[in-house]
Amino acid sequence: DACRVFSEHVDWQGGLEWDFAALHDMPIDPAFTRLVDEYLTDVMREKSKRKGWKLPETTLVLPWIVRMFPDAHYIYLVRDPRDSILGGHKTDDLADFGVSYPTTDDLLERRAISWKYQYDLVMATPKPERWMEVRFEDFILHQERELTRLEEFLGFPLGRIIVRPDSVARWQDADVVPDFDFLRPHFVDA
């Protein structure tokens, strides 16, 4: 619901363009604040020194989350859109979150538009002091290097996990290769 409150303030320019500028300075809608506070009640009550959350939908409201939590550590994990849109995500249809965009019955195109919208929103958001970008492909193929970077950023050691190199560039084996002109600048050569 917080995503829908936020999206009311996004100015769709038509096509694949949105103006996010007002979101950085306007007062945050009190309904949004209430919904986020409700949603994060358990996280905020937690007494641990380290706490947080990982939700893809957070990207849909990033400008206001950054303003509400300016001292948080933000890790932006971004993946080659061709791989990202092969699988389903809760954010596949932006209309579910009140975001206007060119409607299409093509599922991959809808996912591609969602990927672009979220990427554009992140790029338009003034970065907080504690911001780090991690490429999914780098994390998978160079895990130790990326974990070292993350540990330096966060200030504490992280556990190692098993990663699957076959999760990188899986679009190459897809029945239908997602190739949208508006995503090409974001393709990764792993």
Which residues fall in each region the model found?
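Soluble or luminal CAZymes and related metallo-dependent hydrolases
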Residues: 27-35, 54-57, 107-118, 142
